[in-house]
């Protein structure tokens, strides 16, 4: 087994019983693949598939002018490289995007040409089509400097759907069936039955009309309509009664209305008897062809065809007419013998279309189309052209109607056609087929569709959503181009004069900036990033709304298995509408979710893996991943638990066709990080997976001792860690950069064989948490491709580490852990275990005002020297300064208008000159409740404005850093070149050279070492070929130097040009503060099992309960939090964590007494290879074993994968290994070694009972009391009510609400109540009076009229009631 460089350092012991058959796919693949298909940037123009941008262009172009003599054709498009890289865009508040240019061709035809069109002229040109935001390598977008994510949308797939109203519409509870044809874009077509069984259709939820109008409009006559929906009874008329053609199955189950006889007149079925199978057999035996029926059997029948008098050509009776006595009379008079009527019955052949035809008043195709026109455009006169145009545009025009590839495939599958391709518009037979199926449903044949089945819902990803927006923009452009194309020839216009890119840019900008699906990326920790990008939402444009979504849509559906996580979804109004993709889920070409399965042939599991969509899955019998298999892959059990079409059952192995790839296949990333998930109640697991996303990265991340084995995948795929692009040797490493000399076999010829990784240092995330990368390699380390070189936020040695491992005791402690409160030891705070750094960004802009420009300066009047001491000469705070609330960060003055001066001020101005008073201080100060250290300052200056010293210094530092990178690359390139050169020169014969090298001398190593490297090129070689090589190497080095100089120049140009700032802004300064947040009472914490709580008290270490060896617990939790919540996983995690730490302590003890490496090896083998997945420790060298042991002394990390975790027996073994009997006895453990004797820290007495003790991975959540705590002195008031505003953001007051007033009333505290409702709230005069009284030392309240009372009076007056105060 291959271990990567970092895995070797700390192997996670896995308890998995199943081998890994299928690696977890790259977690961000959905986003990245979708967007790259949209752009197709790396595909040459001619080879692009009709997807994404290419599809949008080809669907709109060519654009033809109204007169048809000019057309604009699309050739190809190209994307330029972005002007700024991702980091620069984030700093400058720009969008990371690329300019889109399309090559278009203007073709003008000759108007004078008499016969076929002749091309007069062709102009081809590249036209700018706006900017397209680019996706970062981690699947997000940088829009206006902030990272955003486009969430995928789960919407109803295009196609045809059949459903019923579940009996809710009509009081009788009758099922009303309906069908709906949903296109990808265009008008929806609905068909529905009403309670009277008449079939209607409606277009786009407009007024309903009988469906036969639509059938006539597509060109069917009433006869054809009936022929399509009914079978006919054939009658031959006699003088009295008639002969009915005998069709056996139409009679079965009917009640005979007369005696049925055979040819000889023998009665086979008596009148009023039900006809059964024996009767039918008798009739068939008697070779009955016709049955004689009496006259009244014909009455009430419905004619299937028009009946025409053969002699006169007159229509005697029309199709769909009822047969009456008069009609029969006419028929006999005309000598008509054969008639056909509709066969209907009450059971499975209803007369629905026939009754609908009766309701329909239109006569022919034209009348029907006019009726449809009147419904769509009420009030407009129906001219013939308008009627035709509207009808064709509804379903038959490619511009207005598009079923899409998916829609056509779904439609054809649903109506039972074999081919899955076809035209993208609706065809006449599509409409007919839909109505036929709907009528059959009403007749009781077939099933309605399940809307929530994942085969009926598809996912729209970034690429598709962006393409729709881009197409919408292009369509707007098309309209404008059509108008102008007419003038193209006369005014000699070029293509760029015709196309205005504004509509495209605005459509794209609106989508990425303010669409409901474009969300501010959740960047609290790496897990929250990954989850956000894997999210699937049913909300958004064209989706559901929270209010209208019912219970069914939100519920877990059997088809979610392996596609959408049944656990992870938000609590609250969005529950079930926002989901997360399952670990192995992936999208097929149609946008349906698929999940992988292993093929099973003859009850033997193969290695073939097939991805099945929800519809395909329904056809197979699928076993679960934990089915027992022998070493040959044969299914062992007699009965295997399996699923078919959403039902679970036990079947014999020979019926199994597929098997799950992994037990964790059904859950999402967040849920698969919860160890022992199988022992937790689903509601708590939901909370657990949601709360992991809120974990704040700690200062020193610590890997979870009990994990699930997904941690590494998660950390690496999120992009927080730094991975090696190519293998090589670490040449240089410091806190900020890693330089790797690439292996020769991986280096590309002619390119620099150097990879430089600049690490992210103390950068602010979207949620103000700190993103910081730390190298985990040393100089000289050999790394291979994909190895982790540096840890990021919340990662430890390349594994996700959201919290800290805490020693947890389950016991009550003086009521301090009542109701989920958490008691924490002071040691945890002292060791900075949960300390986190938060980075706040503060901005100030200097604008150009009417009265003159604002100025950023140090020269501010009335500012204390202490405040000025922190500012440099440009008026900007120094980096490293520690600041408190109210301190000045950037000095800024704004000119203020001339005011009327008081005599005192006039005197001051006379003495001190002009400057003092015509500006006001508008400096950037630290907001209330915030303090921290300044860690970075950025200054942006508009083009043409003089840079201050600070801005210049920042640019110089940046250039210095860049030069350092280039020098490193050059150093390594030159080093390699001179090594190659030395190998080539040694032993060659020289014709002469520096230091008096004689002709004919052989060059040796000593001579070369004595010379300066650059003088090697002066050696003249005898061998011409070698001399040419020497020249080539010299040229390549000079070429590289030249390239590096050019790159440096370009960087300098980019930095020294002015910054793009919003209009009217001259300068912008950003100051970054690092705020250190220690754990304190009021902070929210949680485990991974939904066990959340609030820190209630931080207890001195000497008061905490401790073990017999003096080790105190870190956290004390209430045992009552476990049973009722049913998240027992936390208890198992504590046991296994206890074993993990115990093993670590034993390894630490071995290292301390310097045990022999063999002893260490055998102990590690016992841990790793006695049960669960085996590890290949044989391949490790002694040094590697030693390094592994050093990393394990803090606890052996375990992996207990979801649904395939450690058993009780395995945990017992590990506990026995970790705590041999002597240690167990010393700690007073119980026989199963998971409970310990504890002593009270305050009295030293032993607790009566043993306590469950162990290690749990505990998280600090992003709900910090510091961010919520808030107090107000004087602040803003609401305009209307004059009451203080509410909330921390508005610097608001505390609300004294209705119930609080009741409390004071109940106490009878009348004066407190009075001041609360008047002077402390909205009595405007009273408020100012209080201040006056206090200044005068007179402590009296003059309470007046509260403003809200005046508002109430005004409201009542606005109702027309005159209310006035009697002021006597």
From Swiss-Prot:
The reactions it catalyses are: RNA(n) + a ribonucleoside 5'-triphosphate = RNA(n+1) + diphosphate
Gene3D superfamilies annotated for this entry? 2.40.50.100, 2.40.50.150, 3.90.1100.10, DNA-directed RNA polymerase, beta subunit, external 1 domain, DNA-directed RNA polymerase, subunit 2, domain 6, RNA polymerase alpha subunit dimerisation domain, RNA polymerase Rpb2, domain 2
The record ties this protein, via InterPro entries, to:
DNA-dir_RNA_pol_bsu_ext_1_sf, DNA-dir_RNA_pol_bsu_external_1, DNA-dir_RNA_pol_su2, DNA-dir_RNAP_su2_dom, DNA-dir_RNAP_su2_hyb_sf, RNA_pol_bsu_bac, RNA_pol_bsu_CS, RNA_pol_bsu_protrusion
Q: Which key words are in the record?
A: DNA-directed RNA polymerase, Nucleotidyltransferase, Transcription, Transferase
GO CC field: DNA-directed RNA polymerase complex
Q: Which domain of life is it from?
A: Bacteria
Spell out the disulfide connections. Answer: none
Q: Give the enzyme class.
A: transferase
As recorded in UniProt, its EC number(s) are 2.7.7.6
Q: Which GO terms describe its molecular function?
A: DNA binding; DNA-directed RNA polymerase activity; ribonucleoside binding
GO BP terms, alphabetized = DNA-templated transcription
PROSITE patterns associated with the record: RNA_POL_BETA
Summarizing the function annotation, the protein's role is: DNA-dependent RNA polymerase catalyzes the transcription of DNA into RNA using the four ribonucleoside triphosphates as substrates.
What family does this belong to? Belongs to the RNA polymerase beta chain family.
Its assembly, as annotated, is: The RNAP catalytic core consists of 2 alpha, 1 beta, 1 beta' and 1 omega subunit. When a sigma factor is associated with the core the holoenzyme is formed, which can initiate transcription.
What is this protein's name? DNA-directed RNA polymerase subunit beta
The source organism is: Burkholderia ambifaria (strain ATCC BAA-244 / DSM 16087 / CCUG 44356 / LMG 19182 / AMMD) (Burkholderia cepacia (strain AMMD))
Q: Highest lineage ranks of the organism?
A: Bacteria, Pseudomonadati, Pseudomonadota, Betaproteobacteria, Burkholderiales
